[in-house]
Design a protein with these regions (language model features):
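Carbohydrate-binding surfaces of carbohydrate-active enzymes
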Residues: 271, 281, 292, 303-712
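The substrate-binding groove and active-site-proximal loops of carbohydrate-active enzymes
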Residues: 45-55, 79-94, 141-160, 182-189, ...
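Bacterial N-terminal signal peptides that target proteins for export
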Residues: 4-19
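Bacterial N-terminal signal peptides
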Residues: 16-28
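Conserved, mostly hydrophobic/aromatic
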Residues: 47, 66, 74, 103, ...
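Short, acidic/polar
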Residues: 53-68, 159-165, 280-291, 349-357, ...
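Polysaccharide-binding and catalytic clefts of secreted carbohydrate-active enzymes
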Residues: 136-297, 301-314
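Aromatic-lined substrate-binding rim segments of carbohydrate-active enzymes
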Residues: 60-67, 72-140, 164-167, 261-269, ...
Length: 712
């Protein structure tokens, strides 16, 4: 019997080997002979990897350390043009092909970056016209990045050829998930060619000089133009219509610059490969909605810089990015510890990088990628945080990222197909932010901070916020808030009026609808085309040297930086707040008014309220709008994020209280008295236990990932 068993075991071993060989032969092979990739994880941990900076003999050691840390994606190539095309027309992508294949052997996917952010020396030497000209008329030189002219035809031609070569090589590689075009669009050129193209853009937009002169009111200061080539480029201070037109031209030019490469990539790659570019949060150098139109995926670079994670500030940036495409996004770069470009480059606290990662995911990130993997031995960013030191051994942060990788692998299947959604939207407009920045009227007025001042209390109550443009579809929101929507186009005005008439609640903040779409003053008092619906208007605005007292429905508090004297013109308008004794003009006058319009409502808040006032205002507007929290009451400092879809609802809870007393903790009955199924025992949270039992102090010490049982 023993012999038979041995024979049977030998037979089974031979059969298993034969089956494996047959399966191996039948599996499709990708370029370079590697096995075709399986479907990528729903939640990816990644890093920026620069194989061109290191000998090929070191690659696998790096990739092995990535694999051990749970890194499943690398971004490569975005600064390697000189290696890929060492001289004009002589392309060398073999080394990059080998790097992609080496990553694949470790089960690591790749995002390929086109290298146009850093042109090679031969290019800028041979074609100096491809270098940008700054506002002072100085031409950039080689030795940095982003020194190219984004409007130059020759540069676009060479960048397109490079992108085409890359797409032909990697467009059908199943281990390549997608493409990043360029890197962090930012610097523009003020050369003669760009100026001429701007003038042609104006001609296409306005048609005639008479129309342009009328809409810009160029009779002011004798600015009238008699020829298109008389129109200058102005930034910062100048005719408001000209300034806004220049920024719109810049946005369109970045879009066409991007499309120049995007077209050849799309023509040569599989439809499953996405195309993105890495944006920079609240950076206002161009209109991100315009640039995002042609992309498959929005992504951004999440850097805290100096200081520490502010959950509301960072969360708003995630929600802004999610709004560029109206769906989940990627964090293409984030800091592993510290940066190198602030006045004080403090490192993030232990646990803070992990807290950031889960915070990203809660707000809709499907990938979190660290910049960068290993310190370069030289270069401008030697001091920037990395996962490996220059010696090639793990930095102290490596183990924390490894923990994130393990958690992502565990939670990914549950988060698959889920995304945030909200009953509350905040409207955001680049036109409006630019317009206010050019004419602040109070040097301390920051339009981004105005948005955050509304976002912070609203997010705490609703536990989910969308940030969208004023032209977005608004029908699914119970509450829409428009802080500082200074420039209001006819299209946006029509959209907002329709939203209110269909039963929504629109809340406007100060400075709303002062300007038309040419950045000129509206012919009606604020809020311009929305005044009739409001049944009231702004009689006068005041930049504030001191705070002013405000009292009413939102309690007693202060108005800061800006206050507007409101008046009610319709009998059914309710005054919510009034000013106290201040400058005489505002004394006793309405500071906030509201009006029911059929099943809808429209509200105007004319003062930038202090924190307590904003919190009370947020509570009032959410209650009267019927907004429900995504999850339910939680202790102070606990942030809830909800992702819907897939097989149900997934909640992510993090404790940001970070106080000496341990901050918040949920009781035995759980937060909001709820018990649901824990997805993972992350940081001591018990599987199947109450939410966050306990939520310890520290940077997201115990991020709780939970499934709503009702949805499964």
């Amino acid at each position: 019997m023993g012999i038979i068993v041995r024979e049977m075991r030998g037979w089974w071993k031979s059969l298993r080997l034969a089956v494996l060989l047959v399966v191996g032969l039948l599996l499709p092979l990708g370029p370079g002979g590697q096995t075709a990739a399986p479907a990528p994880p729903a939640l990816l941990l990644g890093t920026a990897w620069y194989p061109e900076q290191w000998p090929a003999s070191r690659w696998d050691a790096d990739l092995a350390l990535m694999q051990q840390a749970g890194v499943r994606m690398v971004r490569v190539g975005e600064f390697a043009w000189s290696r890929m095309e060492p001289s004009e027309g002589q392309y060398d992508l073999d080394w990059l092909d080998r790097a992609v294949a080496a990553a694949a052997k470790r089960g690591i996917y790749t995002v390929v970056g086109t290298p146009s952010a850093a042109p090679p020396a031969w290019l800028t030497q041979k074609y100096p016209e491809t270098l940008l000209i700054d506002e002072k008329g100085l031409r950039a030189e080689h030795g940095n990045r982003q020194q190219f002219n984004f409007d130059n035809p020759k540069y676009r031609e060479l960048a397109r050829k490079m992108a085409e070569q890359m797409a032909k090589r990697f467009g059908h590689n199943s281990w390549v998930l997608g493409w990043q075009i360029d890197n962090e669009y930012s610097d523009v050129s003020f050369d003669a060619g760009t100026k001429a193209d701007f003038q042609q853009w104006l001609k296409a937009r306005y048609g005639t000089l008479d129309n342009l002169n009328a809409r810009w009111t160029t009779a002011y200061w004798s600015e009238t133009y008699f020829d298109w080539n008389q129109i200058p480029i102005q930034t910062g201070y100048g005719n408001p219509g000209l300034l806004l037109s220049w920024m719109r031209f810049v946005s369109d030019t970045w879009r066409s610059y991007q499309k120049n490469q995007l077209e050849v990539i799309r023509a040569n790659c599989d439809s499953r490969q996405f195309i993105t570019t890495n944006m920079m949060g609240w950076f206002a150098g161009y209109d991100h909605y315009t640039v995002a139109k042609d992309l498959d995926l929005a992504s951004w670079d999440d850097y805290i810089g100096q200081g520490h994670l502010d959950a509301a500030e960072n969360g708003a940036t995630h929600d802004l990015t999610r709004g560029f495409k109206g769906k989940n996004f990627w964090v293409m770069e984030t800091q592993p510890g510290a940066v190198n470009w602030q006045k004080i480059n403090n490192s993030l606290d232990k646990g803070e990088v992990r807290a950031m990662a889960w915070h990203d995911v809660g707000h809709g990130a499907d990938a979190v990628s660290y910049w960068q993997w290993r310190s370069a031995l030289n270069g401008q960013e030697e001091y920037h945080g990395t996962l490996l030191g220059a010696d090639g051994t793990p930095a102290p942060l490596y183990d924390e990222v490894k923990q994130v990788g393990a958690e992502f692998a565990k939670a990914g299947p549950v988060l698959a197909g889920t995304s945030p959604k909200s009953e509350v939207a905040i409207l955001h407009s680049y036109d409006s932010r630019w317009a206010i920045d050019w004419q602040k009227h109070n040097a301390n007025y920051d339009p981004k901070e105005e948005i955050i001042s509304y976002y912070r209390p609203l997010r705490a109550i609703a536990q989910s916020i969308d940030i969208v443009p004023a032209t977005a579809a608004l029908g699914g929101y119970k509450l829409v808030v428009a802080p500082g929507l200074n420039v209001l186009s006819d299209e946006a005005a029509k959209n907002l009026i329709e939203y209110v008439r269909n039963g929504g609640h629109l809340v406007m903040g100060q400075r709303t609808a002062m300007k038309n779409e040419d950045n000129g003053l509206q012919t009606e008092r604020q809020p311009g085309p929305l005044a009739d619906l409001l049944g009231g208007r702004v009689e006068q605005y005041y930049a504030l040297l001191e705070t002013v007292p405000v009292q009413g429905k939102f309690g007693a508090g202060k108005g800061r930086l800006w206050a507007e004297l409101l008046s009610a013109k319709a009998a059914d308008v309710e005054v919510l707040e009034r000013y106290g004794k201040s400058n005489g003009w505002l004394d006793g006058q309405p500071a906030a008014i509201t009006r029911a319009v059929g099943k809808g409502r429209i509200t105007y808040i004319g003062a930038w309220l202090d924190d307590a006032g904003m919190k009370a205002a947020a509570a009032w507007m959410t209650e009267i709008s019927g907004v429900r929290p995504a999850f339910g009451p939680v202790p102070y400092g606990v942030e809830v994020s909800a992702r819907y879809g897939g097989r149900g609802t997934v909640y992510i809870l993090e404790n940001f209280a970070n106080g000496a007393d341990g901050g918040a903790a949920c009781g035995d009955d759980g937060c909001a008295g709820r018990r649901d199924e824990a997805v993972g025992d992350f940081g001591g949270i018990r599987r199947g236990g109450a939410f966050g039992s306990p939520l310890r102090a520290g940077w997201g010490a115990n991020p709780g990932i939970y499934k709503d049982r009702r949805g499964f």
